[in-house]
């Protein structure tokens, strides 16, 4: 299994200057791609915020909540995330960690909570490779960071 981080998916969905690099990373590292519930949440949230800002001028979480309450969840975001997961044949796995493990990894490897959960989930499933532009994962000894 190969873990795909949020930033790789984001650059593919949103056609950024790093899109080609993200696609190349996937092409050069074929395998059984997985994301956990943290990445699934992050890509939906980040894509929603990007969509609302660029299509409707909505900025900030509070304004986004008001917009969604009034107009409903943007189908374009759901469709884009769903299509990418399907196209790349990404499997969704549950995030797994204990409270004690989380605190230990936060402190020992100086990670943000979401990254610590991802690292622990990878450890639990025996995943040793993560595709990401986030250099913080290089501090995690059981993960090989690509690129």
Language model features with spans:
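Short, well-structured N-terminal submotif of metal-dependent ribonuclease cores
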Residues: 1-38, 46-60, 125
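Histidine- and aromatic-rich ligand-binding microenvironments
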Residues: 4-5, 11, 94, 111-113, ...
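Alpha-helix capping/helix-boundary segments
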Residues: 8-9, 39, 117-118, 136-137
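Internal alpha/beta domain cores that form substrate/cofactor-binding pockets in large enzymes
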Residues: 74-75, 79-89, 110, 114, ...
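Active-site neighborhoods of divalent-metal-dependent phosphate/nucleic-acid chemistry enzymes
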Residues: 82-128
């Amino acid at each position: 299994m190969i873990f795909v981080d949020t930033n790789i998916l984001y650059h593919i969905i949103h056609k950024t200057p790093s899109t080609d690099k993200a696609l190349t990373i996937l092409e050069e590292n074929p395998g059984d791609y997985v994301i956990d519930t943290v990445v699934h949440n992050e890509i939906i949230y980040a894509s929603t915020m990007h969509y609302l800002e660029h299509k409707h001028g909505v900025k900030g979480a509070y304004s986004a909540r008001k917009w969604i309450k009034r107009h409903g969840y943007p189908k374009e975001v759901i469709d884009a995330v769903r299509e990418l997961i399907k196209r790349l044949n990404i499997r969704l796995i549950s995030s797994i960690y204990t409270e004690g493990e989380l605190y230990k990894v936060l402190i020992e490897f100086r990670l943000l909570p979401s990254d610590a959960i991802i690292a622990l989930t990878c450890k639990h499933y025996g995943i040793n490779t993560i595709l990401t532009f986030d250099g913080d994962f290089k501090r995690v000894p059981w993960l090989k960071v690509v690129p």
